[in-house]
Amino acid sequence: MKILYSLRRYFHVETLFNGTLALGGRDQESTGFAWWAGNARLINLSGKLLGAHVAHAGLIVFWAGAMNLFEVAHFVPEKPMYEQGLILLPHLATLGWGIGPGGEVINTFPYFVSGVLHLISSAVLGFGGVYHALIGPETLEESFPFFGYVWKDKNKMTTILGIHLILLGAGALLLVAKAIWFGGLYDTWAPGGGDVRKITNITLNPSTIFGYLLKSPFGGEGWIVSVDNMEDIVGGHVWLGIICIFGGIWHILTKPFAWARRAFVWSGEAYLSYSLAAISLMGFIACCFVWFNNTAYPSEFYGPTGPEASQAQAFSFLVRDQRLGANVGSAQGPTGLGKYLMRSPTGEIIFGGETMRFWDLRAPWLEPLRGPNGLDLSKLKKDIQPWQERRSAEYMTHAPLGSLNSVGGVATEINAVNYVSPRSWLSTSHFVLGFFFFVGHLWHAGRARAAAAGFEKGIDRDSEPVLYMEPLN
């Protein structure tokens, strides 16, 4: 019986399949992997793997540019961003481009520029990807030793890690630069309903910044997702940028300690599994951030959070009925609790009714009406501004409750707009992707550990039908 595939396929993934570095790299015979196994064919071909990664980056940046221009072309300035299904323009708006007071879009040209810049850079990346995939050297070790590597080379791997950390740190500091010097960021908490402003008084106190990391992740505490002011967000990026850059320098200058050499599996597939775990964690954190946080993800662009829409409904009816003569401080609801206002278990005055569960919501349209002990009755009677009424009515009818077939809105709200909020899309997609990336982490970690332990022999193929079929050609 003729064996049509490489038995090396079943041994430790770092084996060079033909004993030399001059690999074909495109067929099953030379790599032990079939065409559909994708980059697995390129495990030991650093030049070709570079091409695959650069081309992948080109595809990502092309999508960003094309989708950006698509959103600009379809954008209607009279409607809020979140009602138009936009997921990229809200991010640009949050960075302060083209935005005036109250989150109003006053200039779409910066969005057009962003799209064009991404398209142009995607062309450069695409050319580089095709060049390295088809023309450039198969391996970089000989011609460009700085860019070459062997997966088992622990020192080189931590050097590459260090370079990545420095780039991430520089990215964090770019946001800081935009906030302080280059026009500022959109701050939803700016007086009068939000505005773009330079963030000058940034929080650098380590007890404040790292205090977020030590908080409980549960209600009322909310871990890092509870950040509610731009000063802390920008200060956090300062700390993160500096830590990443110094960590990167450390990893470039040092070799892994003995405990690290023993603790980790040092192979390409192991690094893939570590990366997938990290991205999975980031996906889950992003899911919580976009769902609950209305400072980093301002409701003017992403739509209200769930608790915010619920509290807005209670507020809107309080405003309406107060105008009709209701005494909102003492009116009783059907359960004997306050109809409009009630006390929380700890004594604060909160909105009554079903929205009591969201009593710890903080939102820029509501906070001015609070006093030292929760909502302030005299402010509710005298100080409500028209912009607060308008915004609350808008949020009440745009709850982020929509199924993916677009049946949206609160079932009990007659005026709900039938749409799916970008908050729903972004949090759901990041949760689902975070989950699948975690499964990918488990899969590749298991394979990498088995290969390192020497018992990864693959699936037993002795009885596979393909072994006794005639080749197609």
Curated annotation (Swiss-Prot):
The chain crosses the membrane at residues 69-93, 134-155, 178-200, 255-275, 291-312, 447-471. Keywords: Acetylation, Chlorophyll, Chloroplast, Chromophore, Manganese, Membrane, Metal-binding, Phosphoprotein, Photosynthesis, Photosystem II, Plastid, Thylakoid, Transmembrane, Transmembrane helix. Gene3D superfamilies: photosystem ii from thermosynechococcus elongatus. GO terms for biological process: photosynthetic electron transport in photosystem II. The keyword Iron does not apply. The modification N-acetylthreonine is found at residue 15. Pfam families: PSII. It is found in: Plastid, Chloroplast thylakoid membrane. InterPro entries: PS_antenna-like (IPR000932), PS_II_antenna-like_sf (IPR036001), PSII_PsbC (IPR005869), PSII_PsbC_sf (IPR044900). Coiled coil: none annotated. The modification Phosphothreonine is found at residue 15. Binds multiple chlorophylls and provides some of the ligands for the Ca-4Mn-5O cluster of the oxygen-evolving complex. It may also provide a ligand for a Cl- that is required for oxygen evolution. PSII binds additional chlorophylls, carotenoids and specific lipids. One of the components of the core complex of photosystem II (PSII). It binds chlorophyll and helps catalyze the primary light-induced photochemical processes of PSII. PSII is a light-driven water:plastoquinone oxidoreductase, using light energy to abstract electrons from H(2)O, generating O(2) and a proton gradient subsequently used for ATP formation. Belongs to the PsbB/PsbC family. PsbC subfamily. This is Photosystem II CP43 reaction center protein. The gene is psbC.
